[in-house]
């Protein structure tokens, strides 16, 4: 059984139909771009493993390359899980340690004389990884697949020009709990789907839910009520209560603040004398 599942009927998903739809979408985008090879950064987590499985479903395992990019503080189990996922789906994969690249930047977690900064040091890791992914994509004349989900997209829980950078985003429309349903259907390794605590591994001991301050099932339900249904915090809480989901108005306010405060991350960079682009999450 998956670690998380949607808790409101509006978020229930037909995995077989969804996989077919995403695979068709991916094939279309690669055909438009005139490319054949997909490059996927594989962390050992559910999002990247699911993205890998979808790429194989769409393009065939011979056209998918996985890159596993640990650094000094990456738990060994993450590398093992990533390798297991790559082997489960039968794709070519490479493991490259990025520790020395991070050290060359003089980040605080690697250079004792520099204080560690959660914002700059932690965000450097996904940005370095994205550089490596695009290097390989250029070498292979391929496209980089993003591994971010809708929950991360709406809350801004991603690094600009890091894990937020990609050529195609096949699971950006799926909430985190929906990703687990798809992962289970695709055959992502059981430990990743059933047991593993979601974490961006930005620093030792970091977890997604600890940083966000709310569990994923409740967060997804609140996001759906606030964004997709367009309800205010009080009405969102009442609406969820009718569906058996307990949440507080304080929770709803906090989630809405995450959406609003991260809107700049979802818009293209503004330019002088250009219309201010709308936040895709808050329009329509």
From Swiss-Prot:
Pathway: Cofactor biosynthesis; NAD(+) biosynthesis; NAD(+) from deamido-NAD(+) (ammonia route): step 1/1. It comes from Methanopyrus kandleri (strain AV19 / DSM 6324 / JCM 9639 / NBRC 100938). Deamido-NAD(+) binds at residues 127, 167. It holds the Pfam family NAD_synthase. Belongs to the NAD synthetase family. ATP binds at residues 41-48, 147, 176, 199. Homodimer. Residues 275-284 have a biased composition (Acidic residues). GO terms for cellular component: cytoplasm. Residues 264-284 are annotated as: Disordered. This is NH(3)-dependent NAD(+) synthetase. PANTHER family: GLUTAMINE-DEPENDENT NAD(+) SYNTHETASE, NH 3 /GLUTAMINE-DEPENDENT NAD + SYNTHETASE. Its EC number is 6.3.1.5. GO terms for molecular function: ATP binding; glutaminase activity; metal ion binding; NAD+ synthase (glutamine-hydrolyzing) activity; NAD+ synthase activity. Keywords: ATP-binding, Ligase, Magnesium, Metal-binding, NAD, Nucleotide-binding. It comes from the Archaea. Catalyzes the ATP-dependent amidation of deamido-NAD to form NAD. Uses ammonia as a nitrogen source. One of its GO terms (biological process) is NAD biosynthetic process. The keyword Cell wall biogenesis/degradation does not apply.
